[in-house]
Structures are given as structure tokens and as C-alpha cells.
Amino acid sequence: IGIDSTHAAGSTRLAQVLRGRLLSEGYAPADVLFFEPQPGKGNLVVRLHGSGRAPPVLYLAHLDVVEARPEDWSVPPFQLTERDGDYLGRGVVDMKGEVASLVANLIRLRREQYRPARDLVVAFTSDEESGGTLSGAEWLLAEHRDLVTAGLVVNPDGGGGEIVGGARSSLRLQTGEKVYASFRFEATSPGGHSSLPVPG
């Protein structure tokens, strides 16, 4: 939360901090690859090697967050704050909480010398939020498809869950995402009524 990774600030610093943390835990440099296809647009691909030949499982996590104007917040947006049992800060929900969880699990799996049946790959990417100019996920597919080709892709940013009365109530699985498209139409016609369409 403390690292500003808005569109204006970029995701490079956060990607480099995560890379340093994973390298300090014993991951090989060849398994923690940093890419910066544009200045400030850092991406990271991490691989935990498995024992089998099955296609990897790929987890996606974007590093960027929506812009935050401090005057719109009751707490500093780039400082993790706990209030009444809730954590507040830009990106806690979307999606630095998930990023932290993925990194913590990569560290734990490494420390426990866990060897999955297939490779686990995590792609930490730039520019998922609106306003970005270079989707890190799309760039990785175009430029390094071999690193992110997988038998199963998990996006913890999709779906969601619900807690009711302090207990987990549901966990939703999302298999698609709505997208938006902007169109501009211009028509010239003498007008009329749908019951009497104008020819042509």
C-alpha cells in the first residue's frame, strides 16, 4: 500500500521491491523475471518449479491502482491503516491485498521446499486499471508467451466473496468479464416514425 503504483507513478518500483523480496528468499534470478516495456510500467513473472510435465497454473495480479486524491480520503491513501478491524488504503481490495497474499504464499512454498505437481507461475502486471496505456498481461502474451502459457489461469481479482456476521458467506467464481466500448454515431435523415419507415 505504501508504494504508489497509480498510472502516474507507474508499477516499476513495486515490481522491483517484490523481485528483491523473492530473490532474498532464495528464488533464482531466472525464476523472477522483471520486464519494463515502457518507462514506469514494470512487470514481474515468477515461477515455482514443479515436478511434473503438466502445463503450469498461472496466477494473474495487477500492480497498478486507481489514482487517489488525499483530500478525498479520511486516511492517507498510500499508508496502510487499520480502523475498526478493517484495513484502509488505496489498493487494499483492488488488488494489493491479493498481491501480498500471492507473494507471502510464494515465500512460504519456497521455505517449505514445496514442489507442486506442475509449475506455478505468477504474473504481476502493469496497467490493468483504466487510464493505462500498456496492459502488462497483453504485452506478456505478445512478447513472452512462453512464460505465461498455462493449462489453467486464475485471476484472484475476479469474482469475489462475501462475509456476513464475521463468517464467510459465499465465494463467487467469475468466468468472464464485462468490458466497455465507446461509440460515436451520427445519422442524417429527414425523420419519421417507425410505423412509416423512410426508404433507403
Residue spans for each PLM region:
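Acidic/His- and Gly-rich active-site-bordering loop/insert found
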Residues: 1-92, 111-118
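A generic structural motif
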Residues: 7, 93, 128, 191-195
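Short, solvent-exposed loop/turn segments at the edges of secondary structure
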Residues: 41, 54, 75, 117, ...
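Fold-independent oxyanion-binding glycine-rich loops
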Residues: 61-63, 84, 126-127, 150, ...
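Acidic/histidine-rich catalytic neighborhood of metal-dependent amide-processing enzymes
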Residues: 95-173
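A short core secondary-structure module
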Residues: 138-139, 195-200
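Flexible glycine/proline-enriched surface loops and loop-helix/loop-strand junctions
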Residues: 167-169, 188-196
